[in-house]
Amino acid sequence: MSDRTSSVLGKASHSMIARAPFPHIVIREALPADLYVRLEATFPTKEILECGRPLAAAGRYAYSAASVAQDKRIDPAWRSFFAYHASDAFFQEVVSLFGATIREDHPHLEERLGRKLTQLRTNIRSQTPREDAALDVQFVYNSASLLPARIIGPHLDRPVALYAGLLYLRHPQDHSTGGDLEFWRFKGGRRMFQGGRKSVRKEDAERVQTIAYESNTLVFFPHSAHALHAVSERSPSVHPRLHVNLIAEFPDPIYHLEEGPA
């Protein structure tokens, strides 16, 4: 898995980075076909991902890298995938691709951390001792619902997070509509949050881009006060919505949620 062709960013280049409404990259057929087929066929069962929790309609269940590494029920291809994408080698891929964007959005970050992005020490989230950046990879299982369901509306992720990577693994027999990733921007040049939280009322923002929930599609973007996103309403389905979530985060926020000019 150290081969970059097995990385979700293996096909990425600087020329593929879109700037609006905030910097991001979309890669379709992100993984080699043979690897994707194996990963799709061995995605963990809901029983593994539930971890004994009751299954709720349209509920979200995540299973992180620290647990995957110890779980022999997980296929070796997945454990290798998780190990690489929670490694310093992958973090350096991200910095090589998005370093300039991260520095532009967070001009004082390296000064605060006391190191260049390329020099940051990483480890897997929840492991101790904690390093500069904690990395994680998660299986994410949004359970099926017999009613239309929206997973989450316009919001920003936690301000300690550096980036988000979403690799979609849509079930071949999933004929539902929706469940797509949406990019939004604030209206009227001002950031407005609900009660100081990360969520935003629809009337205070507008949807500007929709990225379809499609198999073997990667969406990757650095976090900032502008990275407003949502998931569209999904039609009833007997199939879960499946993806892998890629995360890096710091102990302290790298931006703030105060209202003001967008």
What are these regions, as identified by a protein language model?
Residues 2-7, 119:
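N-terminal regions that are enriched for targeting/export leaders
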Residues 1-2, 259-262:
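Non-catalytic N-terminal targeting/anchoring module and adjacent flexible stem/linker
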Residues 1, 78-85, 164-169, 247:
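Short, Φ-rich (hydrophobic/aromatic) sequence segments
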Residues 11-14, 216:
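Short hydrophobic "helix-edge" motifs at membrane interfaces and signal-peptide entry regions
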Residues 91-260:
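Catalytic core of non-heme Fe(II) oxygenases with the double-stranded beta-helix
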Residues 8-12, 63, 67, 138, ...:
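N-proximal short alpha-helices
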Residues 4, 14-112, 116:
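Non-heme Fe(II)/2-oxoglutarate
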